[in-house]
Amino acid sequence: MEMFGKIACFVVFCMVVVAPHAESLSCGEVTSGLAPCLPYLEGRGPLGGCCGGVKGLLGAAKTPEDRKTACTCLKSAANSIKGIDTGKAAGLPGVCGVNIPYKISPSTDCSTVQ
C-alpha cells in the first residue's frame, strides 16, 4: 500500500509539472489581432481580413478575466486612436457574425464584463 501511495504522489507531481500553463490574454494580442480592422474603422478601406481578427479575439478570450482585458484594451484603443468611427466599431461583431458580450465603445464599463 505504501508503494501505491508513492506512485500516486509521483503521478500527481508529474501532472502538475507537465501540465501546460494557461496564459492570460494581453493587450498586444488584442491590438495585433484587430489591426486589420483599422482601415475599415477609419473609413479608409473595406472590411478585408478584419473578421478573422474579431473571431480570433472571441476564441482567445475564454475566461471572464480575458474578456475584461480585451474590453479594456479595445476601449483604450477606441479612446486613443483618432478617426475611428465608433459606430462601425460597435457594429463590428454583428458585421462579422460573432457575439461579443460587450459593446466596443469608449463608454463601455469593462468591469461588468463576464
UniProtKB/Swiss-Prot annotation:
- Can the keyword DNA repair be found in this entry's annotation? no
UniProt keyword list: Disulfide bond, Lipid-binding, Signal, Stress response, Transport
Coiled-coil parts of chain: none
A Pfam family it matches: Tryp_alpha_amyl
Residues in the signal sequence:
1-23
What turns on this gene? Answer: By abscisic acid (ABA) and drought stress.
What family, per the record?
Answer: Belongs to the plant LTP family.
What is the recorded name of this protein? Answer: Non-specific lipid-transfer protein 2
Organism classification: Eukaryota, Viridiplantae, Streptophyta, Embryophyta, Tracheophyta
